[in-house]
Amino acid sequence: KFMGEEELSKLQKIKLISDYISQTQSEIIKHNSNIDIVSDIKVNGRNLTNIGLFRKYTENYLLSNKLINNEMTVMCRQLTPTSQGVPLEIYAFITDKEWKNYENIVSDLFDHLLASLSTFDLELFELPSKININ
């Protein structure tokens, strides 16, 4: 979804994306002012979106973690949408090569990211089961 001023103001308080929001908003305002659009209709110009901001937050969150090897690929990318939603794929390499530690680190990273979804007005898709339907 396109982000409004109130939502951007709230998200700008998140340290890991505050500079990105400021810089990108400045670029968007400049871009949109150079084209003849009705600015109150978001689809007429460039705008920040909740999933785009979550992708950037995810990447910056990984880069800020000392357990991630920043000298190797660190990336969060959007895959082709499906009937189950818009999948995101994360590439990152952990500095600790011990398997148990690796699994704990990855679990902690995903715990945080999954808990952060609602901040960006996003939800995790789960297939319904018999428990959900009853």
Where are these regions (language model features)?
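Structured, soluble regulatory/oligomerization domains located on the cytosolic or IMS-facing side
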Residues: K1-N134
